[in-house]
């Protein structure tokens, strides 16, 4: 015989209509009555109907009808942590509904994981899709929320760690780490180049009214126009065309080479001055040939002249100014012309110095 809610209530109401003596039994210990003489209420019957130790708790009440109902019902729950189930749509608690098959916590955790696996896969796929879209559009790090689902303690922590790992692995370099983007670095380099060129332009143009970019560019344009007008004015004053100016520049460049050769030839100089008492002043200017200084000093030693003071320059040409004194025991008379010819030959020139 199976009992459901309706048959159970009908059986209880039929017993109440009979008005038998057991309904007036003494109250159970710890009853709700203040004076201890009240009868058993319907709530007491419902909550104590499935208790294994109800005979002692009711204090000797004749419970033969209830024992029959308890014998026909299923045994009480085996786990002490399980409680009675309540139906939110029912007015009466059914203590026997919880006596059915219950799931062990490990089985419940595995069932929860099985149910949440499709949802987690869907979330991972959606996260990857959103990450790809963000990379295509140049977005930053992912801002998707992290959810934690119910179930076993170990399963929930593993699932939460897995979801966080998926969410954080799409964009390893986020804006939270302070790493600037490539567009920002390129913009900074562009602005730096622009500022450097504006500073260079500002240093070239003599007339700058203000220091902002617009004024610098405007003053530069006006200065270029002014230079163009000045060039036209000078061309009109000279009376030559630009083609003629180019021809003149070409002729000037070709003639400059000959002038340089003439300057080199005319720059050779050998001066010897006798100041008396064996003191001689020498001044030499010639092209800087290799070994010209050593050959000049050797020639002066051969002539018996001792250098007391000397200044040598080798920038473009070889130049030497020296003050010499006649050595003791040498020839007493050495003419200036002889000194000049000796220095001329020591510098690498043949013939005589005119």
From Swiss-Prot:
Q: Map out region (Disordered) in residue numbers.
A: 124-143
Q: What induces it?
A: Induced by sphingolipid elicitor and chitin elicitor, and a compatible race of the rice blast fungus Magnaporthe oryzae.
- Compartmental location: Nucleus; Cytoplasm
Gene3D superfamilies, per database record: Helix-loop-helix DNA-binding domain
Whether Nucleus counts among this entry's keywords is: yes
What GO cellular component is one of the record's annotations?
Answer: cytoplasm
Start and end residues of each stretch annotated as Helix-loop-helix motif: 192-227
Q: Where does the bHLH domain start and stop, copy by copy?
A: 178-227
Q: Which GO terms describe its molecular function?
A: DNA-binding transcription factor activity; protein dimerization activity; sequence-specific DNA binding
Q: Where is this region: Basic motif?
A: 178-191
Q: Which InterPro entries match?
A: bHLH-TF_ACT-like_plant, bHLH_dom, HLH_DNA-bd_sf, TF_AMS/ICE1/BHLH6-like
Chief place where the protein resides: nucleus
Keywords assigned = Cytoplasm, DNA-binding, Nucleus, Plant defense, Transcription, Transcription regulation
Q: Tell me what PTMs the record reports for this protein.
A: Phosphorylated by MAPK3 and MAPK6.
Q: What processes in GO biological process is this protein linked to?
A: defense response; regulation of defense response; regulation of DNA-templated transcription
Its domain of life? Answer: Eukaryota
Q: Which family does it belong to?
A: Belongs to the bHLH protein family.
Q: Assembly and partners?
A: Interacts with LAX1.
* Function as written in the Swiss-Prot or TrEMBL entry: Transcription factor involved in defense responses that functions downstream of RAC1 and upstream of PAL1 and WRKY19 genes.
Protein's name in the database:
Transcription factor BHLH3
Organism of origin is Oryza sativa subsp. japonica
In the UniProt record, the gene name given for this protein reads BHLH3
């Amino acid at each position: 015989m199976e009992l459901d809610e309706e048959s159970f209530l009908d059986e209880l109401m039929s017993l109440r209509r009979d008005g038998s003596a057991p309904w007036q039994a003494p109250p159970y210990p710890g009853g709700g009555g203040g004076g201890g003489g009240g009868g058993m209420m319907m709530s007491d019957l419902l909550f104590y109907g499935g208790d294994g130790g109800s005979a002692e708790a009711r204090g000797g009440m004749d419970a033969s009808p209830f024992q029959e109902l308890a014998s026909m019902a299923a045994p009480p729950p085996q786990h002490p942590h399980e409680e009675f189930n309540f139906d939110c749509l029912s007015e009466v608690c059914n203590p026997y509904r919880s006596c059915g098959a219950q799931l062990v916590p490990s089985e419940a955790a595995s069932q929860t994981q099985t149910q949440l696996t499709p949802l987690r896969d869907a979330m991972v796929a959606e996260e990857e899709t959103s990450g790809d879209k963000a990379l295509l559009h140049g977005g930053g790090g992912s801002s998707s929320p992290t959810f934690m689902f119910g179930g076993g303690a170990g399963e929930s922590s593993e699932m939460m760690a897995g979801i966080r790992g998926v969410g954080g692995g799409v964009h390893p370099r986020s804006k939270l780490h302070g790493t600037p983007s490539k567009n920002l670095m390129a913009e900074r380099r562009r602005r730096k180049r622009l500022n450097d060129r504006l500073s260079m332009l500002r240093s070239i143009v003599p007339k700058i009214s203000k220091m902002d970019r617009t004024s610098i560019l405007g003053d530069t344009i006006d200065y270029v126009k002014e230079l163009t007008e000045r060039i036209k004015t000078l061309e009109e004053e000279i009376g030559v065309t630009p083609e003629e100016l180019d021809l003149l520049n070409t002729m000037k460049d070709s003639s400059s080479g000959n002038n340089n050769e003439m300057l080199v030839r005319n720059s050779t100089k050998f001066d010897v001055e006798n100041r008396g008492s064996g003191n001689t002043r020498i001044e030499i200017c010639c092209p800087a040939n290799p070994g010209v200084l050593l050959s000049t000093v050797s020639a002066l030693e051969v002539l018996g002249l001792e250098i007391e003071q000397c200044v040598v320059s080798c920038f473009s040409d070889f130049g030497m100014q020296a003050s010499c004194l006649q050595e003791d025991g040498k020839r007493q008379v050495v003419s200036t012309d002889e000194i000049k010819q000796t220095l001329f030959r020591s510098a690498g020139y043949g013939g005589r110095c005119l």
